[in-house]
């Protein structure tokens, strides 16, 4: 390979050498200078460029500074405008939030008032319902007591009717059927006619019954009648009223004052609350002390009397009835005398309850005489007078 420079002796022509040519500065022609707009000549222009270089640089820097400041001012103005807009929007939003807060508070207050009124109305309805229920229960209780009393009376009337049939008349209920020896007084107990008439002009017990004459003298006690009229204006079962306080003291208390004081108090409370029940019982269900197993042939289903102990008086006698206090399952057997005393008091309370409820449509005087008759029954029952049972 070939390397290096060629030599002249190898047949090649010698290299050309650079010949220095002197340069002459030639100025532009006149026409060219005119076309350039009267620019200075080249040497003068170069001198001007050399002198104006730092000034141009300072001019550029000042221009940059002025443009930068202008940009900053515009940016500051823009930011101020944006800040003003944001503050304005924020103020509007604050006002809207405040308005919504007021609306929410108003709604909460209205909701609270509505809830309170609803609860108050609900409590009022519940209270009225409870009062109506209590009144209904009280009326139901009283109605049941009346029904029980009427059933007991119906049972007693049925017993009287059955034992007074033509085939088997009840001679004790019809004294005219008794023989003269049975109907008359016992020997050794005869009284003078005038003395007997003077001692009992109104009632005379014959064969276990009270016979009332057809005509009786009546006279209204003004004090008692005034107390009754004052009670009748506003009838109540409160024992503090003068009328009921007198009846309790003179009739109800003594009539229900039995030997067994504790049970007597319970019976009195049950009678006042109208929760006492009197039930007739067959003799075979009684706790027998002395049992007479011979059937007497009665058509009412009772056997011969069975002796037992009265729970109120403590006496051993034939107990055809028993009492139950309230909802208790316990029963207490009572004698006919105790039953008559309890029944007399129950009849009195039933009548004054009818007056209290407005069921008695009478004037004051007939009502007063009916109450006087019921008080008379309590007094007689306390003294031991009662209808003899079949």
Curated annotation (Swiss-Prot):
UniProt feature, compositional bias: Basic residues: 184-194
GO biological process: protein transport
Keywords for the protein's UniProt record, in alphabetical order: Coiled coil, Guanine-nucleotide releasing factor, Phosphoprotein, Protein transport, Transport
Single GO MF descriptor: guanyl-nucleotide exchange factor activity
A Pfam short name: Sec2p
Modified sites of kind Phosphoserine: 168, 179
Coiled-coil residues: 73-161
Span list, region Disordered: 1-60, 166-194
Low complexity biased stretches: 40-58
InterPro entries: RAB3IL/RAB3IP/Sec2 (IPR040351), Sec2_N (IPR009449)
Primary role: Guanine nucleotide exchange factor (GEF) which may activate RAB3A, a GTPase that regulates synaptic vesicle exocytosis. Promotes the exchange of GDP to GTP, converting inactive GDP-bound Rab proteins into their active GTP-bound form. May also activate RAB8A and RAB8B.
Assigned protein family: Belongs to the SEC2 family.
Assembly and interaction partners: Interacts with RAB3A and IHPK1 through the coiled-coil domain. This interaction is competitive. IHPK1 kinase activity is not required for this interaction.
PANTHER family cross-referenced by the UniProt entry: GUANINE NUCLEOTIDE EXCHANGE FACTOR FOR RAB-3A (PTHR14430:SF5), RABIN3-RELATED (PTHR14430)
Protein's UniProt name: Guanine nucleotide exchange factor for Rab-3A
Originating species: Bos taurus
Organism lineage: Eukaryota, Metazoa, Chordata, Craniata, Vertebrata
């Amino acid at each position: 390979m070939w390397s290096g420079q060629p030599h002249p002796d190898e047949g090649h022509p010698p290299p050309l050498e650079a010949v220095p040519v002197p340069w002459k500065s030639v100025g532009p022609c006149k026409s060219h200078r005119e076309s350039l707009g009267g620019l200075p000549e080249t040497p003068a222009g170069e001198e001007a460029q050399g002198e104006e270089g730092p000034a141009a640089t300072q001019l550029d820097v000042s221009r940059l500074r002025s443009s930068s400041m202008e940009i900053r001012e515009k940016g500051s103005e823009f930011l101020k405008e944006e800040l003003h807009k944001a503050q304005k929007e924020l103020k509007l939003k604050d006002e809207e939030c405040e308005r919504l807060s007021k609306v929410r508070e108003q709604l909460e207050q209205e909701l609270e008032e509505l809830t309170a009124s609803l609860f108050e109305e609900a409590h009022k309805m519940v209270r009225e319902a409870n009062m109506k229920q209590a009144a209904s229960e009280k009326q139901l209780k009283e109605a049941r007591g009346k029904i029980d009393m009427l059933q007991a009376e119906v049972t007693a009337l049925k017993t009287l009717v059955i034992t007074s049939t033509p085939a088997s008349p009840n001679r004790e209920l019809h004294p005219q059927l008794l023989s003269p020896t049975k109907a008359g007084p016992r020997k050794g107990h005869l009284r003078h006619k005038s003395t007997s008439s003077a001692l009992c002009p109104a009632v005379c017990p014959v064969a276990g019954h009270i016979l009332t004459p057809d005509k009786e003298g009546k006279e209204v006690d003004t004090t008692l009648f005034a107390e009754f009229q004052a009670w009748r204006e506003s009838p109540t079962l409160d024992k503090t009223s003068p009328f009921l306080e007198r009846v309790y003291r003179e009739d109800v208390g003594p009539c229900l004052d039995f030997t067994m004081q504790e049970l007597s108090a319970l019976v009195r409370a049950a009678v006042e609350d109208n929760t006492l029940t009197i039930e007739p019982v067959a003799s075979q269900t009684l706790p027998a002390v002395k049992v007479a197993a011979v059937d007497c042939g009665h058509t009412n289903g009772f056997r011969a009397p069975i002796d037992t102990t009265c729970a109120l008086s403590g006496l051993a006698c034939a107990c055809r009835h028993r009492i139950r206090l309230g909802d208790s399952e316990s029963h207490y057997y009572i004698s006919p005398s105790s039953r008559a005393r309890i029944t007399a008091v129950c009849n009195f309370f039933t009548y004054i309850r009818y007056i209290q409820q407005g069921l008695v449509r009478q004037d004051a005087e007939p009502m007063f005489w009916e109450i006087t008759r019921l008080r008379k029954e309590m007094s007689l029952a306390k003294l031991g007078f009662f209808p003899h049972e079949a």
